[in-house]
């Protein structure tokens, strides 16, 4: 695995990654704000074809837009990041899909979890985003398009657009064969 924008401080050992973000880091392209940011921290590996990636993570969310989760990246103009983002004083499940321009969807969490498990599955032109809060049952959060037939980088990401020093911890990151394409099959 390698870094796209290594953070100023990080440690990794035995399936455990902890990082502290640099100042005003983010991934975003154009929409609403009119700027491009490609300064977030992304610890990734390259994957060919279809796959499923899973990670458990937590963060010390305190400032506007503090965020942690998983990213799938084809290049600087085509990517998806998903996880927790702190906005309006609340943790939100968050997905940003970028195909030249970024979009953003959020779901507020009234009971902030200690840890979130996130699962991203790529099947051709689709990336399915699923989450689990405190148990083994995954729920779908988003189904998004990313151009098929291109290698992708996938791995943990974290950003802090309004500050430095956001601490995020990731555990048990795994990439393997894709789960079933069926969106509504029981697990």
Q: How would you label these PLM feature ranges?
A:
Residues 1-187:
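Extracellular glycan-recognition regions
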């Amino acid at each position: 695995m390698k870094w796209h924008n290594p953070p100023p401080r990080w440690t990794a050992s035995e399936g455990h990654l902890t990082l502290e973000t640099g100042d005003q880091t983010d991934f975003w392209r154009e929409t609403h704000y009119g700027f491009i940011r490609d300064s977030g921290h992304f610890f990734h590996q390259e994957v060919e074809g279809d796959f499923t990636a899973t990670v458990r993570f937590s963060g010390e969310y305190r400032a506007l837009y503090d965020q942690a989760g998983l990213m799938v990246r084809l290049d600087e103009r085509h990517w998806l990041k998903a996880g927790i983002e702190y906005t309006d004083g609340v943790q939100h499940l968050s997905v940003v899909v970028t195909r030249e321009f970024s979009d953003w969807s959020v779901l507020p969490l009234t009971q902030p979890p200690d840890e979130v498990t996130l699962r991203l599955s790529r099947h051709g032109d689709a990336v399915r985003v699923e989450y689990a809060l405190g148990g083994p049952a995954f729920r779908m959060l988003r189904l998004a398009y990313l151009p098929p037939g291109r290698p992708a980088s996938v791995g943990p990401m974290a950003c802090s657009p309004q500050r430095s020093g956001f601490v995020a911890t990731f555990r048990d990151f795994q990439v393997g064969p894709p789960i079933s394409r069926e969106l509504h099959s029981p697990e």
